[in-house]
A protein has these predicted regions:
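Phosphate-group recognition and catalysis centered on beta-loop-alpha active-site segments
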Residues: 21-59, 63, 70-345
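Bacterial Sec-dependent N-terminal signal peptides
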Residues: 1-22
């Protein structure tokens, strides 16, 4: 009996330790926004988890361009907006009840395009380059799309790579190490892109958002959540917060992004949640196939009333595109970005 009790207690302790290890154990410093709005000098709130902020000092290369209010709101000095740079690096030195914390943030002038056009897997169909290639991303940027969507899987040794399907050229991504995957060439001669290289290419400009889809893992939920954590960590490592919005068919992965990155804009893809459910769970928006919205036509107005953004995929027909524009959806994901651009212009 004693042995059974001891084993049970050990199992409980192990479970609690494991669950705790998945949470942020240290104070996490973040901003509620990473862009400088066109019509305002206010960027966003400085926030921290697990403790409170006593004071904030600004440092770094562009320290003199920013100021912090008494309620910890970060803003840019109006005269500094004329500086001929699209990005500013700022270090926030924060004193808390638990000690001091210093972190670098990249703030981006909000010059991102607003035309509703999201290039599905980049602009590939009419350009002759492979979908989800860096070349397809660059074509989407050149066209002037508001966003370029792409898909992320994780190798057997935990490297995120960009590809739509769980396998590439017959090779399972989740069951293959990165050293082998990264020898695979796309049709245009590019190597299979790592997420890091893809993000770096996207961050060379400040016009087109990067719409990052976290793909559910063929190995199950645990692997999907592991990928989610890798993705968010890499976005923060590269200071890519201003560029990246998140989408996924995996509801738990979406919620994990929001837990790890409370500032993140996250939309859900599967179409099995009502706007009210998404709003309750603090989603940024819904991102549903057009068939879902045809079956639930009132969801568009419901989403608007809940202040959720609305993206519809994957729409390639002119009449459907025009009808959705009349309904004033926020974004349309399409394999025909050139066609949609010709309509919105």
């Amino acid at each position: 009996m004693k042995k059974t009790i001891i084993l049970t207690l050990l199992q409980v302790v192990f479970f609690c330790m494991n669950a705790f290890s998945q949470d942020r154990q240290q104070p996490y410093l973040y901003l509620t926004n990473y862009t400088i709005p066109k019509q305002s000098n206010t960027i966003g709130q400085i926030r921290i988890t697990t403790t409170d902020i006593k004071s904030v000092a600004v440092g770094g290369e562009h320290a003199n361009a920013f100021k912090v209010s008494k309620d910890h709101e970060l803003s840019v000095r109006p005269d500094k907006l004329k500086i001929n740079t699209a990005t500013f690096d700022v270090v926030l030195n924060v004193k808390t009840s638990a000690g001091e914390l210093s972190k670098t943030f990249r703030i981006v002038k909000d010059e991102f395009i607003r035309n509703k056009v999201i290039a599905h897997r980049g602009a590939w169909k009419n350009t002759g380059v492979p979908e989800n290639s860096v070349a397809a991303l660059k074509y989407a940027v050149t066209l002037g799309c508001e966003g370029s969507e792409f898909d992320v899987h994780m190798s057997a040794d935990s490297l995120p790579v960009v590809n739509h399907d769980p396998a590439i050229q017959g090779v399972s991504i989740a069951k293959t190490n990165a050293s082998e995957l990264l020898t695979i060439k796309l049709a245009n001669g590019e190597l299979l892109p790592t997420l890091e290289n893809y993000l770096k290419a996207g961050m060379e400009q400040t016009k087109t958002k990067l719409i990052l889809e976290i793909k559910p893992s063929e190995l199950g939920k645990e692997s999907s959540i592991a990928l989610t954590r890798k993705v968010v960590a890499l976005v923060e490592k590269l200071y890519a917060q201003a560029w990246v919005d998140y989408i996924s068919f995996d509801y738990d992965a979406c919620k994990e992004v929001m837990r790890l990155a409370p500032y993140a804009k996250v939309a859900y893809l599967r179409g099995d949640k009502t706007p009210a459910e998404l709003a309750t769970d603090h989603f940024f928006g819904l991102d549903y196939n057009f068939n879902v919205l045809e079956k639930n036509p009132d969801w568009i107005e419901q989403a608007k009333s809940k202040k959720l953004t609305i993206n519809v995929w994957t729409v390639n027909d002119r009449l459907q595109l025009e009808e959705l524009l009349k309904k004033n959806v926020d974004f349309i994901t399409t394999n025909e970005p050139e066609l949609l651009l010709s309509i919105v212009k």
